[in-house]
UniProtKB/Swiss-Prot annotation:
Organism domain of life: Archaea
Annotated positions for site Important for substrate specificity: 163, 215
EC main group: transferase
Gene field: mtnP
Protein name: S-methyl-5'-thioadenosine phosphorylase
Length: 257
């Protein structure tokens, strides 16, 4: 079974042809969609469309626990997450790729843990993302001459609404990009000892910029971003070593009370 899982959108189908569809039942309900298993450049991977096959789940209703649990049940050890984000800084331009290294959680009412009792866990999130995977994707993006930022802080909001101008100006003080789907996905993966890397693609500037949003321009950028991510996945995934040496699973030794 696959050891690499991808959570993202329809753009993944550009490099991935499903060979098998697996329905996984979890203690947390059904995942966003049945898991599709196929290959990217000869490497077996599992794929879940985060928002559902027909984009039926808004960000605050994505079954995050079921998605991560289902991948783990299939034997997935590494998760590659793809997100579209808005920019909070001038230098993070539409069309750029950001390999996120930190996040700030401004969500409000999601299911954040697998451990609601009687077993209690306090997982370390000081460095939430797998250093081994981050290095591979950063180096590969540079090889492909893609516009990549090696670091970025992602502020995750509840959604589905966008920010007010006041909120956007506040978020600018401590984050680089803004989105709605990183949390609780990243902490759930950590609770199961899985490696997790986030590839965020910038679609436009958030409302702090006070620039009129051109819907056609946003769609054009999103299409280009899909193509960039496809190139990145095709080149990077074959570089991922069979055995993990990153220590992401070590958190399981210290997180239980």
């Amino acid at each position: 079974m696959p050891k690499i899982g991808i959570i993202g959108g329809s753009g993944v189908y550009g490099v991935f042809e499903p060979k098998e569809v697996v329905k996984v039942h979890t203690p947390y309900g059904r995942p966003s969609a049945p898991i599709e298993i196929g290959e990217i450049e000869g490497v077996e991977v599992a794929f879940i469309p985060r928002h559902g096959k027909y984009h039926e789940f808004p960000p605050h209703q994505v079954p995050y626990r079921a998605n991560i649990w289902a991948l783990h049940e299939l034997g997935v050890e590494r998760v590659i997450a793809i997100n579209a984000v808005g920019s909070l800084k001038e230098e993070y331009k539409p069309g750029d790729i950001v390999i996120i290294d930190q996040f700030i959680d401004f969500t409000k009412k999601r299911e954040y843990t697998f451990y609601n009792g009687p077993k209690v866990a306090h997982v370390s999130m000081a460095d939430p993302f797998c250093p081994e995977l981050r290095k591979i994707f950063i180096e590969t993006a540079k090889e492909l001459n893609l516009p990549v930022h090696e670091r970025g802080t992602y502020v995750c909001i509840e959604g589905p609404r966008f920010s007010t101008r006041a909120e956007s100006r506040m978020f600018r003080q401590f984050a680089d990009v803004i989105g709605m789907t990183l949390v609780p996905e990243v902490n759930l993966a950590r609770e199961l000892g899985m490696c997790y890397v986030n590839i965020s693609t910038v679609t436009d500037y958030d409302v702090w910029a006070e620039k009129p949003v051109d819907a056609q321009e946003v769609l054009r950028v999103m299409k280009e971003n899909e193509e960039k991510v496809q190139k990145l996945l095709k080149r990077a995934i074959p570089k991922i070593p069979e055995e993990r040496k990153c220590g992401c699973a070590d958190v399981l030794k210290t997180m239980f009370v």
